[in-house]
Amino acid sequence: MSKDVFTAVGVGADVGRVLGRLSRVVARKSTLPSLSCVKLWVDDSGSDLWAAASSLDQWYEAKLPVELQDGHPGAGCLVRIDLLSSLLAQCNGDGVEMVSADGRISLNAQGRKATIQTLPISEFPTGPAAGDPAAIGEVDGSAIAAALDRVAFAVSKDETRYILNGALFNEDGDAVVATDGRRLALAKVELPECLRDVVLPTPSLGVFSDLWSRSGFCKVFAADSGIGVRGDDEMVWTKKIEGRYPNYKQVIPAYEDFAELKMDREVFEESLRWVAAVGNATEKERGRTATLQVEGAALRVSARAVEVGESEERVPLSDPPQGAMQVAASMDFLREMSHAAGEESLVLRVDPGPDGKVSSPIVCEAEGGRFIGIVMPMRVA
């Protein structure tokens, strides 16, 4: 019997949905044809059809929602995942039959037919090892996913500082951290031993977060210089970023004498969106800066772009601080930090200094310190 022979029947949209998740780890620019493919194979029980995608640095496998009608254990093939996903998406929810044999896979769906050439299953890279049983822990996936989502905005995009191109699961086992040197975000969450002092790379953040949020309590394991997560009928794995993460604790100021700016979070974010209409009209970074100035019981939020114009809005403050105060910072950084804080009321802590011009970090705390956001200010003209 040919090694690629199997027949399976399922709903095109359901199968396509699973392949859509797997496609997030496919290597887009690889010269290896196999890495642009999805691996389809019959599992050892001979009763289920599985699929896997890989970029060598990442691996994602899942059981497909199909009924296997024919196929012996190990039978399988490689198919271009973009083409297969596109065809399945056009099955309009109708049942689709997938038949693999003789270097081709055929799709039959309510009169629609297509045949795609396949590659031998042997050309696909080997998946990660199962890992040391002692290095396996159980986590509350939804809690970790929520923490990751809150800090992801602060991950560095500067590839020359590779250690910052991901989120840190801290050594203390109680927080997820991300920073790009100009801002920092920390979210408290309980971590198992195998996740401590691990930097999860940026390409894997969304994939892991999605699986964690859908799986609830699930297994995490360390294997092959990487980290993996096992959910219900699926598994994702990624290489870790090797290196020493900067001491982020030194960046978090412990202000003894500080001023608090308390306001409605959504109103503040709306004001930033308003001034961004002018600020974002220029390519210069200075034009994308928001200036925050305390004026009585309100916070004046403004932006000015040379040769473009200026905009402002006043945001009411509850219990406004005494005296004049002014600080400038990236409007995007402020808005993202505010959104991650999540609470109805936003509190920003600043050290105004003797002249009222803030030059030290802007600190945002929410949920009793379970979220901390920091934005470095810009020089006030």
Label the model's feature ranges.
Residues 1-381:
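Structural preference for solvent-exposed beta-strand-turn elements
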